[in-house]
Amino acid sequence: MSHAYPPDRNKSIAWAKHVLITRNRWVILDTETTGIGPRDEVIQIAVIDLKGTVRLDSYIQPIRRKKIPLAATAVHGITINMLQGASSYLELFPRLEKSVADRTIIAYNAEFDKQLLDQTARINQAQQLEASWACAMLQYARFVGEWLAFKQDYQWQKLPFAGHNALADCQAILDLIQKMAKTPMWRPK
């Protein structure tokens, strides 16, 4: 399939190159959750830097749920038994804050991860994470270039090679950024 507007693809390539050149300004974050609703919580979180070094990888004990819904477990494989002995979000927060300090967070569907982290903080009566965010999913949608006229925007794409494990997904996001950065720029003929 050809790109709807190749100069937009170039913008995503340029973004990916910029991220890799300024790698010390960024971290990649991913979460796994009990679901997608207003009562759901983050139960796994990982943060890596742009060299792939793990800054945080932890399960989190949920407060509201005593069982992980089967639909969520079917996606990420996490069961309530796996969370036995895990830190609470409140206990984990200082490590999370340190792992992203002074860096912009890149996430795949950043809006979702930010929303669920904010929600988890409220549920746990914890401080909300203060950070700048960038969305790799929106960049990748623009890179792929599948235009949806009714939305007047690019079709969101699934994360290639996603493992539905927070750490594996962080690595998949890094791999995707590297792939986009290596793509030759489109030049008009």
Regions found by a protein language model. Give the residues of each.
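Conserved non-catalytic scaffold segment of RNase H-like nuclease domains
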Residues: 2-130, 145, 152-160, 164
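Conserved beta-strand -> loop -> alpha-helix junction used to position metal-binding or nucleic-acid-contacting
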Residues: 127-141
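Short leucine-rich amphipathic alpha-helical surface patches
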Residues: 140-147, 181
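Acidic, divalent-metal-coordinating active-site segment for phosphoryl/phosphodiester hydrolysis
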Residues: 165-179
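The feature marks non-catalytic terminal segments
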Residues: 178-189
